[in-house]
Amino acid sequence: MSLQDQTYRRWNVMQPEPGTPGTPGAPEEPEEEKEERAELDTRMLYKKLEKYFYDTRSIHLWGIVDDKSAKDVVTKLLLLEADKPGEEIKFFLSSPGGSVTSGMVIYDTMRLIKSPVSTICMGLAASMGSILLSAGEKGRRFIYPHGEVMIHQPSLGGHIQGVSADMEIHAEQILRTKEMGARILAENTGQTIERIRKDFERDYWMDAEKAVEYGIVDKVINKLY
C-alpha cells in the first residue's frame, strides 16, 4: 500500500461519520434527545461522585434534617462501617436544622458505630445541625473559615391548636427536648448545662472562631485533605 493510500485511510478513520451531531452541516439534534443525553450525563456524574465519596469515606448532608436526609446519612454510615469497621468517616454538613427525631437517629448512629466520625461544617450548622456537628469525634470536629453555628431551643413549629390537655403534652415534649439538647451540647462542648440553657433562650450565633471557643468544633479548617 502506498504512503498516499495509508495517509488517506488514517484520515478517514479520524473523521466522524457524516451527519454526526456537532459536525458541520449535521442536522440539529432534537430537543428531546438533548434532554435525554443531558440526563444520562448527570446520572453518570452522580455515579462517579458517589463512588468517589464512598472511596474517600465521605458523607454529605446539605439542607434540612428530615426523614429522607436522615435515611440517606444513616444508610451510608452503616455501609461504610460494615465495609471497614473502625476506619474514619468524614461527615460534611451545611444545614439549617430540622426534625429533632430524624436528627437524633443520625446522632445515635454516629455514636453507636465503631468508626470515628469527623464532622466538617461547610457553611451553616444551626439548631439540629449544630448538635450533629458537635457529635463528631473529639479533636476531629472542623469548620470552614466563614462557617457559622447557631444554637437555640426547639420550637413548636407553628401555631398549635387543640384542647388544653394536648397543648400541655406539646409543651412538656418541648421542655424534654430542650433539656435533652442542652445535656448533649454540655457533654460535647464542655460548657455547663446552665450556660447552655441560658444561651438556648434566644438564637445564639457563632462565627468559626467563636464556635471553636464554645467547644462546638475543635479547629477552623485550612485545607480539606
Predicted regions span which residues?
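N-terminal organellar transit peptides
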Residues: 1-128, 135-225
